[in-house]
Amino acid sequence: MSSRIIVGSAALAAAITASIMVREQKAKGQRREGNVSAYYNGQEYGSSAPPQLGKLHNIKQGIKEDALSLKDALLGVSQKAREEAPKVTKRVISPEEDAQTRKQLGQKAKDSSSQSIFNWGFSEAERRKAIAIGEFDTAKKRFEEAVDRNEKELLSTVMREKKAALDRASIEYERYGRARDFNELSDKLDQQERNSNPLKRLLKNNTGDANTEEAAARSVQGWGDTAQEFGREELEEAKRNASSEPSEAQKRLDELKKIKEKGWFGYNKGEQSEQQIAERVARGLEGWGETAAQLSKDEMDDLRWNYENSKKQLDKNVSDAMDSLSKAKEDLKQYGSHWWSGWTSKVDNDKQALKDEAQKKYDEALKKYDEAKNKFKEWNDKGDGKFWSSKKD
């Protein structure tokens, strides 16, 4: 619209200028023609120009022409086109052509509108996406800072405790982790036990003999005696450990290694199975530096329980054997008495059979009694551990 106004204004100025020039040209022509014309009785003769209409007519004519020029400039229609318009035959547009034209214009407007909206929507989406990414990054950063700050505040106490526990564990690990071989580790453990409580040392007797049964028997020596006797044995053992021989801890570990490689022996341990014993020893070998104290305590309790129960069983065996022997002795005495004499030969034969049976029972009872008594004696023997050897039989 603004471009039309500018073009119209320029055309108006040109039209006004042309109108002024036309009026001036007409005025000059009239003056020129008036010079050659003749007047008679107030009328002009010999002139081809139209009669003079006067200044008022000229002014009206100029205004009319100026108005037409202004109209042409505003509507964008040239004078020539207006003059030729009546000569042009008006073409009648059919309804089908008009509908097709409208459809094409509508489709074009729709495509233009859709394309414009799409472009605007895509750009706006990109802009909002960029804004959202920036806001998300900012929020995420603030959230992480808040979480980090809260975690530090809430977990500071726990972390200090965990750090202290870790430091303690690291120190403990360093104590054992610096051991370069098995001997050095066993020496450290042995020294640690001697410095703490010698009564907690178990399986630390002389294990030079490869007989595992005798080693087990020696490990329980002293339980039947007083604490003073047990302390004396521990003192003697400590003196042996101080000698130039391999440490008792090393001997114990070597012996347990052999047991693990060759299998555990199957001596009677009450209700405890061979598999449980082997698992306990293997557990001690795999984590010796950590479980030595607990393993020693478990073994001590276990062996003490077995000792007490085995001793009770031996006492009962001796008592039962003695009762059986007394009964067999009474039967033998009864069947060998004098009041059997004077009976028939058949009775004599039966009497002899009963006497032989009583003698046989007596001999068996005496044998069982002697075995029970010997085993009980071996149990209390502190010299060679024959009790455990006899248990194998």
From Swiss-Prot:
It is found in: Mitochondrion outer membrane. Residues 1-4 are mitochondrial intermembrane. One of its GO terms (cellular component) is mitochondrial outer membrane. Coiled coil: none annotated. Residues 86-112, 186-251 are annotated as: Disordered. Residues 194-210 have a biased composition (Polar residues). Residues 23-393 are cytoplasmic. Keywords: Membrane, Mitochondrion, Mitochondrion outer membrane, Transmembrane, Transmembrane helix. The keyword Transmembrane helix applies. Residues 230-251 have a biased composition (Basic and acidic residues). Its main location: mitochondrion. The chain crosses the membrane at residues 5-22. The keyword RNA-binding does not apply. Present with 6490 molecules/cell in log phase SD medium. Interacts with AIM5, FCJ1 and MOS1. This is Mitochondrial outer membrane protein OM45. The gene is OM45.
